[in-house]
């Protein structure tokens, strides 16, 4: 029983540390990895629904996506 309570407390602490990083800051950290190119408003096809600077990604084809405001 003590092990379960300890595990729950550790999980809660880890979650609170992860939540301490603001979402916007987290998105900025991974913007380069997603291949966002804000100067021409294109996004990487693998970036999914998220895109550069909070823009939404619209798939024009399987290989081409454009960031829309």
Swiss-Prot record:
> Signal sequence span per UniProt?
1-20
**Molecular-function GO terms, alphabetical:** toxin activity
Q: What is this protein called?
A: U2-agatoxin-Ao1k
- Organism annotation: Agelena orientalis (Funnel-web spider)
> In the record, what lineage is assigned to the organism producing the protein?
Eukaryota, Metazoa, Ecdysozoa, Arthropoda, Chelicerata
Principal localization reads: secreted
Q: What residues bear Leucine amide in this entry?
A: 68
Per the record, the domain of life is Eukaryota
Q: What family does this chain come from, according to its entry?
A: Belongs to the neurotoxin 01 (U2-agtx) family.
This chain's function reads: Insect active toxin causing rapid but reversible paralysis in crickets. No activity shown in mammals. Does not show effect on mammalian voltage-gated calcium channels.
Q: Which UniProt keywords apply?
A: Amidation, Disulfide bond, Neurotoxin, Secreted, Signal, Toxin
Tissues of expression? Expressed by the venom gland.
- Cysteine-cysteine disulfides: 36-52, 51-67
**Which compartments does it reside in?**
Secreted
Posttranslational modification: Does not contain a cysteine at position 57 which disrupts the cysteine framework.
Propeptide residue interval(s):
21-34
Instruction: Pull one GO CC term from this UniProt entry.
Output: extracellular region
